[in-house]
């Protein structure tokens, strides 16, 4: 599920699950969207840059005090060390490179809008 996914699809899922909000992850690109049936939060993924050309990753903070308004934070870490350890452990070199460049080696899983935004800073 991505920001560009048809809002009707997200609304159908919210309605079907009888949820006020859905908190999802793993798509790799964080976003927040208020819809007619509820709110969709996507945290991104903590272990991989968001294909935005930045070596930092993202995480989402939600508290009741904020009335469940999202606060997205960048997480900086020693990406060179992490990349080198991945290489030492014979993990996929494409992922190790992504840690140092902030862009994914391919965009096959992305809808067109997100694929075209590769390397662009996120505004969330």
Predicted feature residues:
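Conserved catalytic scaffold of divalent metal-dependent phosphoesterases
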Residues: 1-21
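Active-site neighborhood of phospho(di)ester-bond hydrolases with catalytic His/Asp-centered motifs
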Residues: 20-28, 40-44
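Acidic, His/Gly-rich catalytic cores of divalent-metal-dependent hydrolytic chemistry
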Residues: 34-124
């Amino acid at each position: 599920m991505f920001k560009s996914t048809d809002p009707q699809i997200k609304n159908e899922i919210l309605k079907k699950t009888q949820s006020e909000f859905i908190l999802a992850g793993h798509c790799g690109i964080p976003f927040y969207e208020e819809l007619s049936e509820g709110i969709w939060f996507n945290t991104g993924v903590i272990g991989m840059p968001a294909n935005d050309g930045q070596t930092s990753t993202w995480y989402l903070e939600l508290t009741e005090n904020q009335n469940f308004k999202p606060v997205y934070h960048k997480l900086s870490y020693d990406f060179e060390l992490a990349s080198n350890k991945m290489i030492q452990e014979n993990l996929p070199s494409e992922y190790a490179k992504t840690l140092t460049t902030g862009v994914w080696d391919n965009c096959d899983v992305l809808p067109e809008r997100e694929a075209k935004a590769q390397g662009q800073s996120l505004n969330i």
